[in-house]
Amino acid sequence: MPVWVKYIGLAVLAYAVYCILVFAFQRQMIFPRSHIGYAPVALPDNLPIEKFWLNTADATVESWYIPPTGSPADGRGPALIFAHGNAERIDASTGELVPFTALGIGVLLVEYPGYGQSTGTPSQKSITAAFVAAYDMLAARHDVDPSKIVLYGRSLGGGAVCALAAKRSAAALILASTFTGIRAMASRYLVPAFMVRDPFDNLTVVREFSGPVLIVHGRHDDIIPFHHGTTLQKAARHAILLAYDCGHNDCPPDAERFWRDIANFLREAGIIV
């Protein structure tokens, strides 16, 4: 047997082993909850957080609701559901979302199954079930206008809110530093698409979503490349792309500009006045 045939055989074997390992451990890579741990994070003083638990068939998940500043004239106002990145917890994101409440928007943070104090195991199926339960609870609140529920996801959270948008109506989508889909991300590492267990196909959801979409992405993002953001923008029917000079974990670089852009988008979408 020629030497080159042996080398090809070894290469094929190595690739097969690589694919098997990726298939076996992909959820540990996508959902690195074991590396996060649980240590309480200091929250802003006097923040009126309502904490409660949501039950699904596979998990009991922690959720926090921050009511808006002031009350709408008719007693019902807009609300937002937030989904964090894969290496975060809801308490780490709470403080940075407070400006939404100053805009008159209630904020619901939903933990992923298996993260923090929530039970269960994270997967697209279990996360979607948790967010559907959260949405239904939020839409039933006496102080929430169900026609003005916004979905906001960052990084992996973009997949969570897109999966929710495929099952429940939303007034608008905000996708920050997120991907077109896990299969597209996996292809960078030569992983076959059929081996992806949790595809989070954001591109298909965005393409079919009829409402306004705000895409926020850093031009220098080396974790989820910038072209994912531009592809999502082109696929959406009504989308705005906010391109910032930043990477993945430092986006947005200018908080004041970011919140000005957010407020403008929400006004144009008819969420706030």
Name the predicted role of every residue range.
Residues 60-137, 141:
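Membrane-embedded segments
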Residues 230-251:
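Catalytic histidine neighborhood in serine/cysteine hydrolases
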Residues 134-189:
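Primarily recognizes the serine-hydrolase "nucleophile elbow" in alpha/beta-hydrolase
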Residues 96, 202, 211, 225-234:
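Short alpha-helix in the alpha/beta-hydrolase fold that links the catalytic acid
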Residues 252-268:
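Post-His helix in hydrolase/transferase enzymes
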Residues 208-210, 215-217, 221:
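Short beta-strand/loop motif that positions the catalytic acidic residue
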Residues 219-224, 248-250:
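Acidic catalytic loop of the alpha/beta-hydrolase fold
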Residues 7-55:
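An N-terminal hydrophobic leader/cap segment in hydrolases
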